[in-house]
Amino acid sequence: ATGARELVTPCAGCYKTFQKIYPEIGDLGLEVYHSIHYLEKLINDGRIKFKGDLGKKVTYHDPCDLGRAFKMFDEPRNILKQIPGLEYVEMARNGLKARCCGGGGGVLANNPEMAVEMAAERVRDALAVGAEIIASGCAACKDNLKKGAKAIPKQERGKIKIQDITEIVAGNLE
């Protein structure tokens, strides 16, 4: 044993496993955080300070494993809204009604073409509100949204970026 008291994971699927499945087997003896919760804790404790010079519009894609499983909707948006120089824009389909990107649930493994089409539709949702950055809290979503963006003609997708929320926070630390 490492003696660790906390475990932080940036993976939505791993977080779901540590929070919902492993406790059925036994007590981990750890406080488990998704990176979004941990970042929020650090911000609220004053341990993270932001600079802000991006001047970009950002939106948040709700990963199925965080949104539907844990109702984690406000926390990531609150983090993004605290970064100076970022303008938060909300996609029409968000929260429980957010469109799945196709990166999880076996879609990508069983029907990769459909998964990319689903991701492209989600990227179009972000483009429709003028977003220049799509943030997410799930590596599978990030990777599949990137594939979806590449499937959209360059003149339509522009220079939209797909980033994990931890990357956005790290890039804007004081």
Give residue spans per PLM region.
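Iron-sulfur cluster-binding electron-transfer modules in prokaryotic oxidoreductases
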Residues: 1-174
